[in-house]
C-alpha cells in the first residue's frame, strides 16, 4: 500500500499501545496481538505486517535503555571503579543468559512458528503459565537473591534457559524469565529487572533478524507506519515499566496469573465457539 491513510496510522498507534503494555507485563504480547489482529488488520502485505509487529519492539527496547540508563552504563562518570566493574558484570550476565534462546531462536525460529503459532497453542500457554504464576506466589518462599549484584553467572544462565520457553507463542518472554528467576530464588524486583535487561539483546536481535530477512525495500508510508508504531510503543513502555516496577514492590504476580487464565479462555472461546 503506497497511499497515505490516517486509518492505517491509527491502527499503528493502537498496535504500538498494545505492544508497549503487553511486552513488559507477564501476560503475553503475542496473545494480545492475535486478538487485536482479528479486529484491527493493517492493510499491508503479510510480510510487512510480520516485520512491523517485530520491529516496533525497537521502541520498547529504547524505553528500557532510557529508564535504566545509569544502571546499564559502565562509562557513567558518577560511578566509581567498583560500580563500573559491577555494571560490566551485569552485561556479562545478560549476554550469558541470552545465549540459549538466541541459539535456539536462530536455528529453529521458522519451525517453531510453523508448529506453534496458532490460537490453540497461545491459549493453552496463557492458561498453563497463569496457573504456574499463581502457584508460584502461593509458595510464599523468602527470596535468596534480593539485589542484582547477587545474581551469579550460573544463575544467569539458568534464568536464560527459562527464556527459551518464551519461543512458544503465548508463554510471554517476561513471564517465562520472571517465573524462572523467582523459582531460582530471586526477589520479584530482581526477576523483573533481569527480564527487562534480557529483553535488550533478545529483542534487538529478533528485530534486526526480521529486518534483514524482509530487506529494507519499504515504501515511504511503510517506513512512516514503522516509525509511528515504534514511537508509540516507546512512550507507552516508559509508563508501563515505571508502573510495573513500583507495583511489584508492594504486590505479587497473582493478578497477572488470573488475567492470563481469563484471556486464555477468551481466546479459546472466540476461535472455537464464536
From Swiss-Prot:
GO BP, one example? regulation of cell shape
Superkingdom assignment: Bacteria
| Membrane topology listed for this record | Multi-pass membrane protein
Gene Ontology MF terms: undecaprenyl-diphosphatase activity
Q: Where in the cell is it found?
A: Cell membrane
**Membrane-spanning ranges:** 7-27, 48-68, 88-108, 115-135, 151-171, 189-209, 221-241, 253-273
- Name the UniProt key words of this record, in alphabetical order: Antibiotic resistance, Cell membrane, Cell shape, Cell wall biogenesis/degradation, Hydrolase, Membrane, Peptidoglycan synthesis, Transmembrane, Transmembrane helix
| Gene Ontology CC terms, in alphabetical order | plasma membrane
Q: What is its EC number?
A: 3.6.1.27
Q: Which reaction is catalysed here?
A: di-trans,octa-cis-undecaprenyl diphosphate + H2O = di-trans,octa-cis-undecaprenyl phosphate + phosphate + H(+)
Q: Name one Pfam family in it.
A: BacA
Question: What more is known?
Answer: Bacitracin is thought to be involved in the inhibition of peptidoglycan synthesis by sequestering undecaprenyl diphosphate, thereby reducing the pool of lipid carrier available.
Instruction: Tell me the protein family, please.
Output: Belongs to the UppP family.
Protein's name in the database: Undecaprenyl-diphosphatase 1
Species assigned in the record: Clostridioides difficile (strain 630) (Peptoclostridium difficile)
Amino acid at each position: 500500500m503506497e497511499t497515505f491513510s490516517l486509518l492505517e496510522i491509527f491502527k499503528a498507534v493502537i498496535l504500538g499501545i498494545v505492544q508497549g503494555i503487553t511486552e513488559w507485563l507477564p501476560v503475553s504480547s503475542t496473545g494480545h496481538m492475535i486478538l487485536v489482529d482479528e479486529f484491527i488488520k493493517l492493510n499491508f502485505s503479510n510480510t510487512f505486517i510480520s516485520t512491523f509487529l517485530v520491529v516496533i519492539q525497537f521502541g520498547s527496547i529504547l524505553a528500557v535503555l532510557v529508564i535504566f540508563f545509569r544502571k546499564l552504563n559502565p562509562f557513567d562518570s558518577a560511578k566509581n571503579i567498583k560500580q563500573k566493574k559491577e555494571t560490566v558484570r551485569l552485561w556479562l550476565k545478560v549476554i550469558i543468559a541470552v545465549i540459549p534462546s538466541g541459539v535456539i531462536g536462530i536455528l529453529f525460529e521458522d519451525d517453531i512458528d510453523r508448529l506453534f503459532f496458532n490460537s490453540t497453542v497461545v491459549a493453552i500457554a496463557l492458561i498453563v503459565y497463569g496457573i504456574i504464576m499463581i502457584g508460584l506466589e502461593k509458595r510464599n518462599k523468602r527470596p535468596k537473591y534480593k539485589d542484582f549484584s547477587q545474581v551469579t553467572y550460573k544463575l544467569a544462565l539458568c534464568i536464560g534457559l527459562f527464556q527459551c520457553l518464551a519461543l512458544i507463542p503465548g508463554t510471554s518472554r517476561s513471564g517465562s524469565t520472571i517465573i524462572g528467576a523467582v523459582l531460582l530464588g530471586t526477589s520479584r524486583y530482581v526477576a523483573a529487572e533481569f527480564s527487562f535487561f534480557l529483553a535488550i539483546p533478545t529483542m534487538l536481535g529478533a528485530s534486526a533478524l526480521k529486518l534483514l530477512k524482509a530487506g529494507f525495500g519499504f515504501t515511504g508510508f511503510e517506513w512512516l507506519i514503522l516509525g509511528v508504531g515504534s514511537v508509540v510503543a516507546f512512550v507507552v513502555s516508559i509508563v508501563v515499566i515505571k508502573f510495573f516496577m513500583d507495583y511489584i514492590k508492594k504486590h505479587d504476580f497473582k493478578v497477572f496469573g488470573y488475567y492470563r487464565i481469563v484471556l486464555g479462555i477468551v481466546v479459546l472461546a472466540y476461535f472455537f465457539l464464536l
